[in-house]
Amino acid sequence: MERGEEAPTEGAPPEGALVEAKAPVIPEAPATDVSTTEEAGSKEPQVPSGPRPEGAGDTCDTRGARGPPTPGRAKSQKTPRQGTARCQTLESAMRSMSVRLECHDVEEQFILRLPPEQAYAVRKIIHSRNAAWKDKLKIDFSPDGHHAVVQVDNVSLPAKLVNLPCVIGSLKTIDRKTFYKTADVSQMLVCSPEGEPHSPPEEPVVSTGPTVIGISEGKAERKKYNWKHGITPPLKNVRKKRFRKTTKKLPDVKQVDEINFSEYTQSPSVEKEVKRLLYSDAEAVSVRWEVVDDDDAKEIESQGSMPTTPGISQMGGASLSDYDVFREMMGDSGSNSNDVEEKSNEGDDDDDEDEDDEDYGNEKEEEETDNSEEELEKELQAKFNEFSLHEADQDYSSITMAIQKLIFIKEKRLQMIYKKAQRQKELLRKVENLTLKRHFQNVLGKLNIMEKEKCEQIYHLQEQLKCFLKE
């Protein structure tokens, strides 16, 4: 033990060392420290006690264990009984534990905002860790608790304690891996430069009417110390941008008269109806739906969900027609037809496959026709250019053959457009949804324009062919 080892080094007899080993913690009681120290100072003045008072104020939890371990003090404590020593030991242990618990409580912190010069000086003081520099930073609060005077290196700055828009968590770490929360920071001490008047952070607008003064004084006092910005530049004016109160628009008198309060009282029945419709949708074998436009909602009757059975042929045909409509609109080639094929007969499956094959063949034929038409137009244009340069030596037979081929291809393309337009007309008859009708009407209008253009091109080529045949 420490006290047992210190006694021989100071030249004390072995008897004093044994006495200290029996009751090493007796000097920890604060009451006995004062009395024994005085006795030791009066009886044995030769023991040096200069550095001891300096170390007694270092920490808060070792206050009662810093008595000078002198032999005279140990001899003067031979008289107390063993039970009294144990009681004093328990009391001192409890006191030291309470002091340690108080030291680990949550701290009270605030942010100190200083001008650049003073901030640099405070940062230098903190990093130096010199105890002699601790007097260069002082903060004196006024009795109201919201105003203060901050003194940094003999420079006094007026300061105001303001409330931040939100709470900031303060953390500390020792190894830069594990963080411990120390406080919740919600206030900031803002220091203004020396000689500059400190403006309030948020000046409320207070009405001067006699009836409003009493109500607005409390709000004005609260808003007086509210800081409307955050601590970083992106949070400028964040109290109004992010944390402002939502304004409620008051309806006009005419709107209040038009409000039907029965709609609000019937909300439970509406919820029951919605649940019933959802249950019916879940139990249905197949469901029909349509996209309803808000403008035409009054003209269209909502069809809702209709549960059907495989025995009803009309609904089966209707579902197939809907499938054909969506396939035509999205350009699908029959890859998503598994659900429809399971509910149709074998004959319907064969018909669908034949239709898909025809659609695929028509699309392929259209692509080939377009490519050949473009090539023939380029070839004919080149021949026209050669004919204009060498009119006498040019043979008309090659030009007439090219014109005839181009007329044939354009007539074939015209037939395809005509068939497509007829199919769009059939789809328009089957579809009941106005949105789909509008889509197919637009497609049909484009096909009619293409049909007119092809007819004009064919007529122009026929006139050119007549001219070359006459020559």
UniProtKB/Swiss-Prot annotation:
UniProt entry tagged with the keyword Phosphoprotein: yes
Record's compositionally biased regions (Acidic residues): 347-377
Coiled coil region boundaries: 358-433
Localization per record: Nucleus; Cytoplasm
GO BP of this protein: flagellated sperm motility; spermatid development; transcription initiation at RNA polymerase II promoter
Disruption of the gene: reported phenotype: Reduced sperm count and motility.
Annotated region (Disordered), positions in chain: 1-84, 192-211, 328-377
Functional description taken from the UniProt entry: Probably functions as a spermatogenesis-specific component of the DNA-binding general transcription factor complex TFIID, a multimeric protein complex that plays a central role in mediating promoter responses to various activators and repressors. May play a role in spermatogenesis.
Name of the protein this chain belongs to: Transcription initiation factor TFIID subunit 7-like
Organism listed in the record: Mus musculus (Mouse)
Gene: Taf7l
